């Protein structure tokens, strides 16, 4: 019997992107059963937590993600197309989000069918 790990994964998080190759290796090398649990990005579920008048937290995440990508030797940039409708200058998140709910739902369905981490 293999070990099971729940992976809470966001389609917008740079950290979810960075960990994906390691998750695939973990599954292959150690017979770990990965259960993908797609979550909505913080920009949608708790935007006031991240996007306040004080932008230092957002600026830190952007710098940290760039440093992490360089350390891992991975290409990194904002997602294109971005699944979140957001002004990247002011970080204002639009009320209407036509993409992320469907995309996250597709991730949930892929996980339900056993194809979450491929």
Sequence positions of predicted segments:
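Short active-site neighborhood of thiol/selenol oxidoreductases, capturing the structured segment around
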Residues: 2-13
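Structural alpha/beta surface segment adjacent to cysteine/selenocysteine redox centers
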Residues: 11, 17-118
